[in-house]
């Protein structure tokens, strides 16, 4: 090793800026982004039994229910628990959509969801960090 050799210069890779979230996005897009963020923080619970336990413990911050749930008793139970414990409730049209948002699917190499399993009920116990999508969801819930 001679003194003529220069130390290699390490250049950090460019950091990709997160995609800007438009202020005028619709509720379903905002809910999808909110659930994705909450899932990354481990704050999403799926299934009727686990959701009912969290609602009764008053840990649930938001409950998302599929409108096309094939068990009317599930819908009645979740709505009653939310009303009784004053938990915010949102509904989505499809259980398959909710299952995809909850992570009950396989993601192929192109980033598309496949083998999606339906999800009738989902509870968010931790939203993670505050985002624009979360504020849109909160505004919608407050206006109900």
From Swiss-Prot:
Location of N-acetylserine modifications: 2
Coiled-coil stretches noted in the UniProt entry, renumbered to this chain: none
Pfam families in the cross-refs: Ribosomal_L7Ae
GO molecular function, one term: structural constituent of ribosome
Stored InterPro entries: Ribosomal_eL30-like_sf (IPR029064), Ribosomal_eL8/eL30/eS12/Gad45 (IPR004038), Ribosomal_eS12 (IPR000530), Ribosomal_eS12_CS (IPR047860)
Disulphide linkage map: none
Family: Belongs to the eukaryotic ribosomal protein eS12 family.
Name of the featured protein: Small ribosomal subunit protein eS12z
Primary gene name: RPS12A
């Amino acid at each position: 090793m001679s003194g003529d050799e220069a130390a290699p210069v390490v250049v950090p890779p460019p950091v990709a800026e997160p995609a800007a979230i438009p202020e005028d996005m619709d509720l379903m897009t905002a809910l999808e982004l909110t659930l994705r963020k909450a899932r990354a923080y481990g704050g999403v619970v799926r299934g009727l039994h686990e959701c009912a336990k969290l609602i009764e413990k008053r840990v649930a911050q938001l409950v998302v229910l599929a409108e096309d749930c094939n068990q009317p008793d599930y819908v009645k139970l979740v709505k009653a628990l939310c009303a009784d414990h004053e938990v915010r409730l949102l509904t989505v049209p499809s259980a398959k959509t909710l299952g995809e948002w909850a992570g009950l699917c396989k993601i192929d190499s192109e980033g598309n969801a496949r083998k999606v399993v339906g999800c009738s009920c989902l509870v968010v116990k931790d939203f993670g960090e505050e985002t624009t999508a979360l504020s849109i969801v909160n505004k919608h819930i407050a206006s109900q």
